[in-house]
Amino acid sequence: SKSLSSAMEYGVEQARTLLAGRAVLALTGAGISTDSGIPDYRGAGRVARHPLTFDDFMGSKQNQARYWARSYVGWSRVETAKPNPGHLALAQAEQSGRVFSIITQNVDGLHQKAGSKKVLELHGRVDQVLCTGCGDILSRPELDARIAQLNPEVNRSQDVEFTPDGDAEVEVGKS
């Protein structure tokens, strides 16, 4: 419609004025990674999801088993995801000095894969794992090798629904 078009043109002009000659801070969330195959929490047609909290994770061995089973199966989606034009555009804007830093809610590492250097990940990252017992940091491939050795019955190639945090809907105790 004409009013929507006018509003969009006005918004673009306002952004152009704001950005003229200045570097900006980019804030991103799950939406930037959906074109890379990583689902978001609240996209069209999605059922609202409530991620496991740290307290819930730490308070229950069953929650820990469920989390790691889902994460083990779903990790391949994140590991093989490629940056999309949005990630690449932000990396180019950073390299040219138009973006001075990126703050993201995402844990997928796609900004870094695109070439961005100054990225603050508010929710951490899934390619590194912190041991809550001793504080050691493991690479995700190292942890996956341990999980595979301890759980040879788990079928990573099963047809599953992938979720926003780089995990998958699976039932603990089933492969």
Feature locations, PLM:
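Conserved catalytic core of sirtuin-type NAD+-dependent deacylases
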Residues: 1-175
